[in-house]
Amino acid sequence: MSIGSEVMPSLNPSFTPINWEQATPDTLLERIAEAKIVGMGGAGFPTAEKIALAQKHPPNFVIANGMETDPGVNADKVLLERHLDDVLTGLRIVAKILSAVQSFVAIAHERTVQDAQSLLIDNETVRYLKPTFQNGAERELIQILTGHVVKDNSFPAFDGCLVLNVHTLFAIAEAIAGKPLTKRLVTVNDETRWIDIGTPVEEILESRDPIRVGCYATGKRPRANEVLTAKVNAISNDKSVRALPCIHCGWCDEACPRELPVESLFVLAEQLKPNLDVQDALNRCNDCGACVIACPSNIHLLDHVRALRQRNDTERERISRATQARIRFDAREQRLRSDAMSSDAKRSERMQQQHKWQ
């Protein structure tokens, strides 16, 4: 299984190249579904389904998300430097499917912005944005570029906004050209290269130290026999193995772009039990990893936040099951009482009847 620096996806004999400018939106969407393309910015949601959902809520804005905000990760940057034209082709394919009124390209590298400006066509805009932790988030990106605020209880597609990672758009262009999704660019300890999807992560980064799937700040420790998937943009060494005790400096609270009480969440997480009083804060956390980078003790605070969130999810599920069980029990008791009363009434009625033998 090759792990090369410049090996590109090869032509699949089962995929016939499509002239996207002449093809119908249904034909293009069908190819995207056939290629099994998923969100490659981390979500992993089937792209064809996401586009189809946006189709139902015109008018549409399409955003190419090149805001790579994970510290030390350069996969999107390298892709844009080497295959910007393919990314723009993917953007135009999606815009055609949706009959989009405007397309945006958000990039965190000024030189690439200059390159993109010379390739734009009508109804396309490229914007340079600072690579902050929040600027790469879907909802924040929509607000910055379109001025529209997506409600917390809604989805961007419901508001006619579709955000796709630049890797996803590249994969779309490749699929339309007859090339399946078999590889992706991955940053492995500051080196970015093409790696086969399906490669065991332990083979990608051979290290005596534990590793994380994703960048150090937001990645997770791999499961047994875990392999590279299309949504993984980095493999990193795990610095948290050298973590020191918390010194209560408060840097994590200051670093959090959503002003969450990170240190308090960490203290609660260390108690190894659920705490539903902080559920709102856990819901507002978007796992950006800013607290992890800020921590001078190398504590992976996001691990603890995720663990507390998982314990709360389990607790809410337990409460829900207990509530449903209580409702079923009360309904059964009521039914038994009703049956008993009905039986007593019928018995009393029979006793009062005039029988033939009397």
Residue ranges and their predicted role:
Residues E34-A52:
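Conserved phosphate/anionic-ligand binding catalytic regions in large, soluble enzymes, centered on
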Residues N60, S99-V201, L205-D209, C215:
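Hydrophobic alpha-helical positions that pack around
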Residues D76-D85:
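Short, glycine-rich nucleotide/cofactor-binding loops
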Residues V62-D76:
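Gly-rich Lys/Arg/Thr-decorated short loops/hinges at beta-loop-alpha junctions or inter-strand turns
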Residues I235-A243, W251-D253, P257-R335:
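Ferredoxin-type iron-sulfur electron-transfer modules in oxidoreductases and energy-metabolism complexes
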Residues M1-G39, K56-H57, F61, D85, ...:
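Iron-sulfur (Fe-S) cluster-binding modules
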Residues R212-I247, W251, D280:
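A glycine- and small/hydrophobic-rich beta-loop-beta segment
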